[in-house]
């Protein structure tokens, strides 16, 4: 009798719980690949996070029509049937922001892949697995800031810091942007995990507790106090980019190119060598072996910070959404990456976000749009492709962060674009070019000639050159003039090459022959770089500047000698050793230091002028 009574009580509790939660559940009405339609969803909001089916697959509401909601599911929907439950969570798709982001690899919706592997013992992500993005067991040494009990605090204020790793030794703990109040208690120095309460704030008579982490919806840009104009270069270590087509910290860059042109290599060299504090690398729909390459190479690569070598993985977060992962999650991966970048910008860091490749993201938009039955535009892409791209790129920039103390950070976006067949009139490329300020166009013919980086200097451009002239004038006088001269030589040589193909080189004047010879020298020894060598994998800006001076000095001296009546064929023969010295300038090891480099290059400049003076006598 007692057993029957107990069972009846349990059943009543279960039924009352079901009644309570019934309003939070809908039912699946139809399934079409990653797009699921659910009914009985009155009260749900756009972009609300839902759990689909008995496996609790993660999905997001993207359209509401009456009591029906259309959901894009971020996991494989095989086995989901009509009538399965859909649980509404009442919150948007958000990411966790706090200590532990560095050195971690996530999927498109910020699930930590290593933690999932350890938990599931599988190389694939089990459906419906729910692992927190930030480790709940790792302890961090929290140091409170200058704020104390009784002080007023607003969104973005720094109330403490932790040591995350030797490259990020001052990870600032921020109050979420929408929070404010008066501090009622703050934790003392000590070890805490990301869920432990370290701050208690009272506002309007209510007390709120805050830990070292907070969540933020990925589709909402994090607020800033003020947007600033960017004026400091994003140095890549690639001579052709730093000299001719520079980008700024807080700028937007597009790298379109056909398959095998070296987009991923440029993206990876940016991650390895750029002057950014934090790198967010988003592999969006690219091949899995490219992400595996990053994972294997990065821990072995070192950067020198204040005299000590550190693995660059310590400043990197990877968001891997490879081509065999669900299509819908590609869209989320771009937003996840930019939200992580904005979080570090709010700490006063200069962040580079590399998206490889935004074409795969656009393809995911096209597939979802097609399944929704929306009107297709150019090449089947949705009509809102340009607006989606613009809203993403507009989240880049240099800004003053919210809260105190004052800090300035930046987010630079470098996005690779893979147009089919290398056709730059592709809708994704044209939409991207209308938004981004720097265009590094890759050339298939250069790549086939093994000329890397395969940047086509005649189609590439940067709208930041004038903005950066102030920086160059104060640090490297003559830089702008040298850059313009190199561009002029290259464009003149292109016209002369067409003449040579028609009438031969002998028909050219000596002055034109010099232009052609120096252009070849610039292409082979300045624009080209060997990424597998110690001397050329990374070229500091001072070495780039000194090499520019050497090439232009050689060109000017040759032109001066010919103008004074010397014959170029004889002059070239008698000064061949100087030409060899100029072309060998790239072999100088940057590790020997700037002082030694400048000394060696100034000796080279004086040798050039002396040898030409002797030869023309």
Curated annotation (Swiss-Prot):
Is a probable target for sumoylation. Pfam families: ATP-synt_ab, ATP-synt_ab_N, ATP-synt_ab_Xtn, ATP-synt_VA_C. It is a peripheral membrane protein. It is an enzyme of class 7 (translocase). Keywords: ATP-binding, Hydrogen ion transport, Ion transport, Membrane, Nucleotide-binding, Translocase, Transport, Ubl conjugation, Vacuole, Virulence. The keyword Lipid metabolism does not apply. One of its GO terms (cellular component) is cytosol. Its EC number is 7.1.2.2. InterPro entries: ATP-synt_VA_C (IPR055190), ATP-synth_a_Xtn (IPR031686), ATP_synth_asu-like_sf (IPR023366), ATPase_a/bsu_AS (IPR020003), ATPase_F1/V1/A1_a/bsu_N (IPR004100), ATPase_F1/V1/A1_a/bsu_N_sf (IPR036121), ATPase_F1/V1/A1_a/bsu_nucl-bd (IPR000194), ATPase_F1/V1_b/a_C (IPR024034). It catalyses: ATP + H2O + 4 H(+)(in) = ADP + phosphate + 5 H(+)(out). Disruption phenotype: Leads to a defect in vacuolar acidification and higher sensitivity to oxidants such as H(2)O(2) or menadione. Reduces strongly virulence in mice. It is found in: Vacuole membrane. ATP binds at residues 257-264. One of its GO terms (molecular function) is ATP binding. The record marks 460 as: Required for activity. One of its GO terms (biological process) is intracellular arginine homeostasis. Belongs to the ATPase alpha/beta chains family. V-ATPase is a heteromultimeric enzyme composed of a peripheral catalytic V1 complex (components A to H) attached to an integral membrane V0 proton pore complex (components: a, c, c', c'', d, e, f and VOA1). Catalytic subunit of the V1 complex of vacuolar(H+)-ATPase (V-ATPase), a multisubunit enzyme composed of a peripheral complex (V1) that hydrolyzes ATP and a membrane integral complex (V0) that translocates protons. V-ATPase is responsible for acidifying and maintaining the pH of intracellular compartments. Mediates oxidative stress response, filamentous growth, and plays an important role in virulence. This is V-type proton ATPase catalytic subunit A. The gene is TFP1.
């Amino acid at each position: 009798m007692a057993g029957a009574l107990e069972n009846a009580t349990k059943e009543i509790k279960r039924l009352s719980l079901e009644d309570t939660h019934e309003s939070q559940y809908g039912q699946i009405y139809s399934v079409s690949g990653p797009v699921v339609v659910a009914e009985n969803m009155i009260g749900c909001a756009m972009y609300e996070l839902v759990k689909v089916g008995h496996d609790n697959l993660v999905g997001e509401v993207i359209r509401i029509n009456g009591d029906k909601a259309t959901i894009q599911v971020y996991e494989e929907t095989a086995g989901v049937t009509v009538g399965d439950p859909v649980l509404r969570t009442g919150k948007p798709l958000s990411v966790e922001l706090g200590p532990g982001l560095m050195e971690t690899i996530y999927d498109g919706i910020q699930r930590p892949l290593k933690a999932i592997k350890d938990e599931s013992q599988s190389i694939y992500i089990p459906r419906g697995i729910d692992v927190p993005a930030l480790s709940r067991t790792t302890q961090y040494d929290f140091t409170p800031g200058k704020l104390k009990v009784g002080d007023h605090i607003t969104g973005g204020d720094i109330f403490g810091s932790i040591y995350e790793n030797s490259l990020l030794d001052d990870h600032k703990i921020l109050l979420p942007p929408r929070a404010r109040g008066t501090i009622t208690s703050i934790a003392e120095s000590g070890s805490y995990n990301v869920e432990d309460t370290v701050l208690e704030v009272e506002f309007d008579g209510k007390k709120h507790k805050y830990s070292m982490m907070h969540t933020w919806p990925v589709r909402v840009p994090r607020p800033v106090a003020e947007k600033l104009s960017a004026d400091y270069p994003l140095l890549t270590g690639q001579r052709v980019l730093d000299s001719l087509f520079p980008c700024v910290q807080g700028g937007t860059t597009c790298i379109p190119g056909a398959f095998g042109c070296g987009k991923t290599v440029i993206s990876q060299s940016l991650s390895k060598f750029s002057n950014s504090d934090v790198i967010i690398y988003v592999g969006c729909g690219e091949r899995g072996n490219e992400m595996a390459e990053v994972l294997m190479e990065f821990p072995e690569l070192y950067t020198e910070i204040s005299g000590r070598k550190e693995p660059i993985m310590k400043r990197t977060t990877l968001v891997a959404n490879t081509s065999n992962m669900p299509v819908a999650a590609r869209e989320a991966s771009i937003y996840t990456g930019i939200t992580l970048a904005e979080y570090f910008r709010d700490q006063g860091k200069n962040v580079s976000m590399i998206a490889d490749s935004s074409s795969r993201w656009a393809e995911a938009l096209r597939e979802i749009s097609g399944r929704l039955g929306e009107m297709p535009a150019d090449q089947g892409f949705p009509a809102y492709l340009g607006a989606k791209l613009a809203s993403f790129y507009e989240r880049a920039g240099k800004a003053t962060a919210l809260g105190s103390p004052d800090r300035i950070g930046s987010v630079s976006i470098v996005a690779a674009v893979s147009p089919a067949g290398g056709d730059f009139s592709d809708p994704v490329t044209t939409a991207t070019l209308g938004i981004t300020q720097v265009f590094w166009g890759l050339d298939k013919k250069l790549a086939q000639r093994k000329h890397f980086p395969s940047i086509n200097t005649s189609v590439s451009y940067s709208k930041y050159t004038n903005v950066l002239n102030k920086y160059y004038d104060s640090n490297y006088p003559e830089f702008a003039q040298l850059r313009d001269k190199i561009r002029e030589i290259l464009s003149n040589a292109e016209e002369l090459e067409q003449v040579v193909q028609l009438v031969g080189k002998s028909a050219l004047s000596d002055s034109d022959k010099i232009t052609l010879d120096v252009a070849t020298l610039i292409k082979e020894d300045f624009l080209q770089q060997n990424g597998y060598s110690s001397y050329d994998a990374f070229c500091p800006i001072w070495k780039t500047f000194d090499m520019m001076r050497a090439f232009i000095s050689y060109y000017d001296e040759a032109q001066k000698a010919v103008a004074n009546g010397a014959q170029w064929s004889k002059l070239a023969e008698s000064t061949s050793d100087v030409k060899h010295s100029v072309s060998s300038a790239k072999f100088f090891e940057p590790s020997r230091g700037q002082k030694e480099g400048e000394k060696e290059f100034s000796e080279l400049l004086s040798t050039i002028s002396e040898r030409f003076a002797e030869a023309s006598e």
